[in-house]
Amino acid sequence: MTLPRSRSQSRRRSPLRQTSWLAVLSMLAAIPGTALAHSFDERYDLPAPLPYFVAGAAAVVALSFVIAAVFSRRKVGSLERRPQHGRAIAFGPLPVLLRGGILLVRALSLGLFFLVIASALFGSGDPLMNLAPTLIWIVWWVGLSLLVACVGNVWPVLDPWLTLFDAVDALARCMGWRGGIVLGLAFPRALGAWPAVALLLLWSWLELVFPLATAPGRVAFAALAWSALTLAGMVCFGRAAWQRNADVFALYFDVLGRFAPLALHPGGRGLVVRAPGEGLTVMRDSGAADIGFVIAMLSTVLFDGLRGGQAWGPVEAAFARSLPALADTNAYAAGTAGLVGLWLVFLVAYWAACVAAAGLLGGAAGGAGGIARRYVWTLVPIAVGYNLAHNFSGLLVQGQNVIPLLSDPFGWHWDLFGTAQRYPDIGIVDARTTWYVAVAAIVAGHVSAVWLAHRVALRDLREPRRAALACVPLTVLMVAYTAVSLSVIAEPMVRFLPEPAQAAFMAFGIAGFKSGDG
């Protein structure tokens, strides 16, 4: 990736500001692919060896299980299934105004979508000078995911494909087409939500494996192809069937929104305020595809961190030695195998935990399959925590690029809003803060998952002792995942070992390894 040119040649800059801007661009230009969203430009010297942090975090997660088992002996009746948990807040006389505001937001979102397509097609070929890569990979995919998880699911309002489909469908009905533009084909029941799982893995492949994911031309092609697939699916099967089974973004943001403290009341007349994660305890019993989808949410973000560290180098080398015919300069084969392989490993690990739980319960609770279907939603907080840990620094630093890019979306030296000369503040967050935010996010996500699993077990089994017994294997799995995820997130951020030993630590785990302060 070449150094981008100056954004504006009409304004004179002081030598200091120009040097600072070029330094920022030089640093960002050295980051390949979609590492733009989660890079770390300095390392933090830990005050204690990393294994102490890992062991402490794992101990906190294990202790949360003990606390949940001992202190959550509440009446089972209070955990009965209800349409919504939480406190409802009515909108009052505002629905008309809200509908008008929602229509305006949907129109603006659709207009921004067209702007992204246009900038990707006709704008600068430099990803740092083009609005499309930053808006899609950083602001939307990373930023909106965290917003939805922390606040509520706003994606149905922002979804440009849904807005475009609804607009064309409404126009067709006004023109006398009774059925609108929907063909009314039946979505194959045998497929279930597996198309969404496949598309999530494909999207992750584009983000993590494909080396030109930030190239504006490739972004335009991917966006147009994705638009064609989504709109064709809704036309053939209807928007509800497509979004329920194949619209990966609708499903992804819906799952994250279940973790959020705010939700729309089922009647649409108000909001529901609830504890974070409460919405996951009232999710429907899942199918095999739902399990695969949630596991993909976990495995893909961990693969992102793993592939960005030193431990991935030996993996690629071993892959090339074992299968030389599949080796390639861009590491497509190794990256694809790693992405799918880690997903399969997580599936097997989760299934093994469910089999163990069924064994402890003596075949009750529907066996391993029933446990797997009911408890998979409790893993979502782990995905939220790791997503925050992995992308916190990148979102704060790289996300600032959208401010000047909105004034010059095509890289044509415009300054529409007077922000084209706003330079990213790379010192907005340091490695120390990033590290402790990462530790807190990972631990909080796993503790929340343990607590939710115990809530679901207590609701289903209606006996505190058996509920605790059912959660033991899942807690062991979560403790192990805490150690692995914290080790992976630490590798590019902190200095805890000499370089060769650091790679060995990441590749082979922490068992039996004693490190110094490095």
Indicate residue ranges for each PLM-predicted region.
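Interfacial loop-to-transmembrane junctions
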Residues: 450-478
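Membrane-helix interface motif
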Residues: 32-40, 118-125, 302-320, 395-410, ...
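Hydrophobic alpha-helical transmembrane segments and adjacent short intramembrane/lumenal linkers
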Residues: 379-387, 391-444, 450-454, 462
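Final/C-terminal transmembrane alpha-helix of multipass membrane proteins
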Residues: 387, 468-492
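Long, well-ordered mid-to-C-terminal structural blocks that present hydrophobic/aromatic surfaces
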Residues: 310-403
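Transmembrane-helix bundle segments that line or gate the permeation/cavity pathway
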Residues: 23, 34-275, 289, 303-307, ...
